[in-house]
């Protein structure tokens, strides 16, 4: 599989490198003896990034079948990820991103059913935000994370994590517009139960900000007219705020439509933290109102605390499902 990944012909090409589209990769769901790939590894036929102007692609992945060899002939082995229905209504094994893309499209459609007005930008942000990563988040460097994103995107698409909070994991959703003259300071409540927990890395915050900027194909590599930068700022006992520096630059590039990062916390104050949002434009008429969807998740890493109830008792947030 390493030889396939290193082949320049395996790189994602137009139109799959579109910044505003959802590019879907394929991950093998099972291991087969005569396949060059295996479970949770990029499928032999799935293309890798980077995409346009060096930005990470694919955006997200789904499980699919693999390609194996029966003597000298390539075949698609039968497993629960390779079976598709043919024109005669029979289940047959087949493989390709043509089959993983509908999986992600279906997930997006299901998520949209619980989102107010079936808002596509919020649905898409939730899809990206809750993708299941296929790498060790605690033991990966910048270069390795960039490679992972160019093989797997943000991870495996999942519906349930995108539709619901849980007792120990609370997700906040906000949508709006930004321009050059307007900045957002979005308040997010950090539960007291969580702040009182002793130990290291007791809490995790994950932020995804997805924007829908204007585009102009005549601008070449600058066809994307704007981007929104997101940062997290934790509260101090004095009432001031301290900007939190994420571990990686990956996921926070200028002129990307999606800024996404996470951070674990050990010692911190409860109360209102802030997500700062700022828009940057680069055309002469670049002061457009740019729609965005912001998703923020606060998680108890022990899984034992009911932080959802504490947030609910504030009576400040409206449940959307």
Q: What is the role of each PLM region?
A:
Residues 27-101, 118:
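Catalytic-core environment of secreted peptidases
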Residues 146-234:
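Secreted peptidase-domain scaffold signal
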Residues 100-114:
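Short, small-residue alpha-helix embedded
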